[in-house]
């Protein structure tokens, strides 16, 4: 991710483009006892994974301040292709799941002007034009690259305090289906626009790792979301400040219980309801 200064608000884009963030989508059900912890349940691994996914950026070595929503999310689904009922159902399920994990108010709206999160179900034929009109991309080389190489895409914009105030997700349904990625596109892109923008092969099992074959939220993803929206974790925090706070949270009895139960809890809601 490359950032470019602006005066008042910031947009992020990955890979590349200033102050927009563009993402590409490329379990057991029992809760283990604490003595049976796997690698992703270890405190240091959780902290390192949080830094990797929340503060780092896919196409830049820059470590960013923490970004998160500090206001309710009102989402509008724009249907530019068929299967409206299915697309609405899976979107509602996953956003309700995210709301439950994070405590964020995530509310559907029929008013596109009121929405601060727009989810577009479209086709790959329309993608290049949508990158111009919905993502406001101007560089034709980037438009060509993203429209050819991306399965699904998302961006968000932040204010000067690093709070997220707007996001857009585009899912070209025919392309996503061709890659058997429709459900995982919905899960990954909508999760990333909450403030977990990076992908990393160092974090697994996770939807943020293209090599781990996780199409739906993992126990580790559940923990990262819980930490991101913990009251002590603030937008704008830098790595040096956030790491000791994360360690303190993780050592609390309440969060230790969450670590134990994460795999079980994450499987009880959202897209998993369609699979069980």
Question: For each predicted feature, which ranges?
Answer:
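Short, aliphatic-rich beta-strand segments
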Residues: 74-78, 169-171
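N-terminal secretory signal peptides that target proteins for export/translocation
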Residues: 1-15
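Metzincin-family zinc-dependent endopeptidase catalytic domain
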Residues: 87-187, 192-193, 197-201
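Metalloprotease/metallohydrolase-associated module, dominated by Zn2+-dependent proteases
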Residues: 59, 143-181, 197-276
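Acidic/polar N-terminal loop/beta-strand segments that form early-domain functional surfaces
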Residues: 78-80, 122
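N-terminal signal peptide c-region/cleavage motif recognized by signal peptidases
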Residues: 25-31
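Disordered inhibitory propeptide/activation segment of secreted metzincin zinc metalloprotease zymogens
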Residues: 34-74, 81-83, 100, 150-159, ...
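Sec-dependent signal peptide recognition
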Residues: 18-23
């Amino acid at each position: 991710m490359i950032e470019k200064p602006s005066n008042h608000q910031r947009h992020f884009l990955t890979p590349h483009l200033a102050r927009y963030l563009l993402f590409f989508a490329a379990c057991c059900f029992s809760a283990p006892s604490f003595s049976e912890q796997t690698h992703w349940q270890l405190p240091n691994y959780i902290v390192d994974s949080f830094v990797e996914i929340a503060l780092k950026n896919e196409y830049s070595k820059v470590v960013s301040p923490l970004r998160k929503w500090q206001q309710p999310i009102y989402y509008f689904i724009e249907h530019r292709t068929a299967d409206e009922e299915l697309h609405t159902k899976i979107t509602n399920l996953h956003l309700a799941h995210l709301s439950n994990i994070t405590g964020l108010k995530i509310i559907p709206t029929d008013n596109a002007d009121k929405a601060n999160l727009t989810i577009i179900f479209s086709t790959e034929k329309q993608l290049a034009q949508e990158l111009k009109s919905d993502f406001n991309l101007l560089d034709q080389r980037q438009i060509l690259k993203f429209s050819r190489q991306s399965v699904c895409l998302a961006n968000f914009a932040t204010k000067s305090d690093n709070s997220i105030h707007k996001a857009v997700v585009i899912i070209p349904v025919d392309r996503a289906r061709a890659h058997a990625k429709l459900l995982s596109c919905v899960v990954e892109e909508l999760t990333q626009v909450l403030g977990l923008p990076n992908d990393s092969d160092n974090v697994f099992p996770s939807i943020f790792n293209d090599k781990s074959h996780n199409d739906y939220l993992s126990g580790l993803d559940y923990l990262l979301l819980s930490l991101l929206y913990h009251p002590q974790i603030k937008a704008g925090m830098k790595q040096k400040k956030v790491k000791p706070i994360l360690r303190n949270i993780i050592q609390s009895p309440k969060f230790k219980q969450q670590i134990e139960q994460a795999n079980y809890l994450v499987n009880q809601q959202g897209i998993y309801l369609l699979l069980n």
